[in-house]
């Protein structure tokens, strides 16, 4: 039996779906892990843009967005849990104190309150952010089990992949952090 000190904390890591990922919801995804503890894990899929853009989402929640470069930024599918709820992964904003914000080890924050979107709409919010609808969640031990069955690769997250890399390149870019490419991955799990 492992001691609590033996636990691996995957907070601020990418989960990269292996080719043998059985769940089609996560096939080909990169998930940024916002929280990982003995109670479970919470992450956001960062490479599945939806057909909803910021302008249409802001209209739905009665916020006016007039900042031209932001209007057509896509909203992402963050995962199959709470798909009606928004999750904003962002760099910290000096002096900002959003109502429902969680600091993530490694420097990013995740905010679920509308005030961060109000700040974005007025130009006072985070400059680099990713907005998702929904999140990915795992119960106690569930993620560890999926990793042990070769469902996921893990690697320390790089914010440049989250914020600066085009969505369609994030999977390969995350694999590149491990020094591999998708052509090197096998769908077959091997055990000695």
UniProtKB/Swiss-Prot annotation:
SUPFAM superfamilies: VC0467-like
Protein family membership: Belongs to the UPF0301 (AlgH) family.
Highest taxon in the source lineage: Bacteria
GO cellular component terms attached to this protein's record: cytosol
Protein name: UPF0301 protein Bcep1808_0798
HAMAP family assigned: UPF0301 (MF_00758)
InterPro entries per record: AlgH-like
NCBIfam families for the chain: PRK00228.1-1, PRK00228.1-2
């Amino acid at each position: 039996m492992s001691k609590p000190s033996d636990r691996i904390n995957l907070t601020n890591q990418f989960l990269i779906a292996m080719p043998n990922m059985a769940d089609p919801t996560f096939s080909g995804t990169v998930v940024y892990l916002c929280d990982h503890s003995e109670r479970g894990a919470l992450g956001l899929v960062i490479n599945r843009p939806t057909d909803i853009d910021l302008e249409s989402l802001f209209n739905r929640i009665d916020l006016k967005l007039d900042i031209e470069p932001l209007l057509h930024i896509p909203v992402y599918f963050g995962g199959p849990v709470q798909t009606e709820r928004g999750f904003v992964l962002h760099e910290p904003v000096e002096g900002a104190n959003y109502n429902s914000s969680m600091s993530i080890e490694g420097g990013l924050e995740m905010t679920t309150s509308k005030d961060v979107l109000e700040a974005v709409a007025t130009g006072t919010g985070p400059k680099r952010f990713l907005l998702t609808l929904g999140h990915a969640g795992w119960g106690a031990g569930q993620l560890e089990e999926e990793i042990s069955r070769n469902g996921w690769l893990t690697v320390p997250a790089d914010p440049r992949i989250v914020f600066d890399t085009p969505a369609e390149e994030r999977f390969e870019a995350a694999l590149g952090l491990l020094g591999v490419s998708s052509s090197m991955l096998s769908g077959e799990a091997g055990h000695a």
